[in-house]
A protein has these predicted regions:
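Gly/Thr-rich phosphate-binding beta-strand-loop-beta motif of the actin/hexokinase/Hsp70
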Residues: 2-28, 103-120
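Glycine-rich phosphate-binding loop plus the immediately following alpha-helix
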Residues: 43, 121-151
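Active-site cofactor/substrate anionic-group-binding motifs, chiefly glycine-
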Residues: 86-107
Length: 151
């Protein structure tokens, strides 16, 4: 993990009910390393395991900033010393616009809830979430993916 332009990385953490995701990105926005783990109802242990895997026994590189999102964002932010903690509506909107700049609608089916986000002029205009704990929507998709061998 050597950043040739300028030493330093940014750490992104997303702790959800199904998965824990960590990404280490250099100052140019290039992904240096990413980790995907099953949360398994143990968000703290999953985060610690992810941080250990991210460094793979090496000294942690210079982290210029860290951010946390997901249903476990507050917990992850405190444990990792995040500089910023953002809700999933905001992070989905920003991420989607990085991939598709003129995106207008985002639909997300998660382990706990489902969301629809409407953007106007690059800003979240409206959003809605289901009112019942997902009724297993994300968990259902997760099980089907496992049956198909999709990580």
């Amino acid at each position: 993990m050597r950043n040739t332009k300028e030493d330093g990385y940014y750490l992104g953490i997303d702790i959800g009910s199904v998965s824990t995701n960590l990404v280490l990105m250099d100052t140019d926005g290039k992904i240096a390393k990413k980790i995907y783990l099953r949360t398994g109802g143990q968000p703290i242990q999953s985060l610690i395991k992810g941080l250990k895997e991210l460094t793979a026994g090496q000294r942690l590189p210079d982290i210029k900033g860290a951010g946390a999102t997901g249903s476990g964002r507050e917990l992850a932010g405190v444990i990792a010393g995040a500089d910023i903690i953002k809700n999933e509506i905001t992070t989905h909107a920003i991420a989607a616009q990085n991939v598709v700049p003129d995106v207008k609608t985002i639909i997300e089916i998660g382990g706990q809830d489902s969301k629809i986000i409407i953007l106007k002029n690059g800003v979240v205009y409206d959003f809605a979430m289901n009112t019942v704990c997902a009724a297993g929507t994300g968990s259902f998709l997760d099980r089907q993916a496992a049956r198909l061998g999709v990580p």
